[in-house]
Amino acid sequence: MSFQCVKKYEDSYDKYVLAATSEKVVLPDYLDKESKKIAETIIKKNKFTAKASEKISMTLVNKKKVIEFIIIGLGEKKKLDAKNTRQYLFDGLKNIIGKVLFSFDNKDLDNIDILAEVVEHINYKFDKYFSKKKEEFLEVSYLTDKKVPKLIEGYELAKISNIVKDLVNEQAEVLNPKELADRATKLGKKFGFDVEILDEKKAQKLGMNAYLSVARAAHHRPYVIVMRYKGNAKSKYTFGLVGKGLTYDTGGLSLKPTDSMLTMRCDMGGAATMIGAMCSVAKMKLKKNVTCVVAACENSIGPNAYRPGDILTAMNGKTIEVTNTDAEGRLTLADALTYIVRKEKVNEVIDAATLTGAIMVALGEDVTGVFTNDEKMARKVIDASENWNEYFWQMPMFDLYKKNLKSSYADMQNTGVRWGGSTNAAKFLEEFIDDTKWVHLDIAGTAWASGANPYYSQKGATGQVFRTVYSYIKDNKN
């Protein structure tokens, strides 16, 4: 176990860590008088003031035992919030390994959830395919007299974040649509939600032709994954979640360049996000009803691949001219959204998708784009992101963007003009939600880290966004 809470000091730890604010460093009671005196001298000599992300290490003889004592700075107490507390704890702990006794110098900072999350985040590594694996980890025992809840939300969600990251980091040769469906089924059994798998024949009967056209050339066949959590039998309100589930995307006949294909294992990041949200809702036993749909498939090339110029009839009866086979995600989402609205009859929908490169041009790698037909709902989703180290920004959804989707041969086309690409994609999706309240999250930047982000510093899957979705559902009065 990488994290636990303890109530008393022991001398068996490899390191002893104190997180302190810059107002005044208050040394822990477990240090004896002589150790405190020496520590105070070292602090003064090194002009250590516990500024944000500042760190000092010293060797002390405490109660006749040699210990390594480390103080990490959190900066000014009044400036601390959930986001920067995470960052400063991460900065202070990320290079520490072994068994650690951790404490805050101020009980007002006593935050089990954030600390547990950071520890699990530091320890994560997708090393499945390395011949030599990471053997040393950070194991934190948190010294607190606070009553510890049976389920520490931050810790449980951090472990689920690892599941999300594993799904996204897994190579596409392994994580094909069938494997994704199987893993969702196993997670349903583990966490406590029902899973129904619709094969290609069932999807055909439902008229999910836009989705199935994308999957046509792939060796691995498509599967629709339907997950249902019933946490409140008395409520008639159901939250709907949809995740883009492209387990690999070549771009189809509108073939991607090689460099763009290298990270396309992450094109099912939306699916992983929503599976993570389902696991979280079930694990924390929220008294809510939630249904999630993932239309999983691969976008490949082959003799029967769908083509630019093809006209498809979606599940809701609308016709679509294909102008670019690399704008496939919105085609799969179109039918998934129709399915969850018309068949599952949810009251509102949030979808998450690694949908457009345009959102990264607009917002960079670290911000999720938010699109909606309901301002109040979007505001609540954005507010929920403030609970986590995540950044959301609402994008425009003016009706004038609809002109960019006009086709000479069908009701609409799947791509518009180059400009405003992320909103064009969102306006396309809006055609498939009927009158249901809806928020679309474009996570093309935030699902995958290049290594430049100070918190998501490990290249690969970030495990972001599912926590925001979870918090939104948890805090919602419906």
Swiss-Prot record:
Any one GO biological process: proteolysis
Recorded catalytic reaction(s): these are: Release of an N-terminal amino acid, Xaa-|-Yaa-, in which Xaa is preferably Leu, but may be other amino acids including Pro although not Arg or Lys, and Yaa may be Pro. Amino acid amides and methyl esters are also readily hydrolyzed, but rates on arylamides are exceedingly low; Release of an N-terminal amino acid, preferentially leucine, but not glutamic or aspartic acids
Residues given in the record as Mn(2+) 2 binding sites: 244, 249, 267, 328
Query: Which keywords are on file for this protein?
Result: Aminopeptidase, Cytoplasm, Hydrolase, Manganese, Metal-binding, Protease
Tell me the domain of life: Bacteria
GO CC terms of this entry: cytoplasm
The prosthetic group or cofactor this protein requires is: Mn(2+)
- EC code: 3.4.11.1, 3.4.11.10
Any idea where this protein resides?
Answer: Cytoplasm
Q: Does the keyword Cytoplasm apply?
A: yes
Free-text comment on the cofactor: Binds 2 manganese ions per subunit.
Disulfide cross-links: none
Q: Which InterPro entries match?
A: Leucine_aapep/pepB, Macro_dom-like, Peptidase_M17_C, Peptidase_M17_leu_NH2_pept, Peptidase_M17_N
Q: Where does Mn(2+) 1 bind?
A: 249, 326, 328
Q: Which GO terms describe its molecular function?
A: manganese ion binding; metalloaminopeptidase activity; peptidase activity
Q: Does the keyword Lipid biosynthesis apply?
A: no
Transmembrane region(s):
none
Where are the active-site residues found?
256, 330
Q: Which NCBIfam families does the UniProt record give?
A: PRK00913.3-5
User: Which protein family is named in the record?
Assistant: Belongs to the peptidase M17 family.
* Function field: Presumably involved in the processing and regular turnover of intracellular proteins. Catalyzes the removal of unsubstituted N-terminal amino acids from various peptides.
Q: What's this protein's name?
A: Probable cytosol aminopeptidase
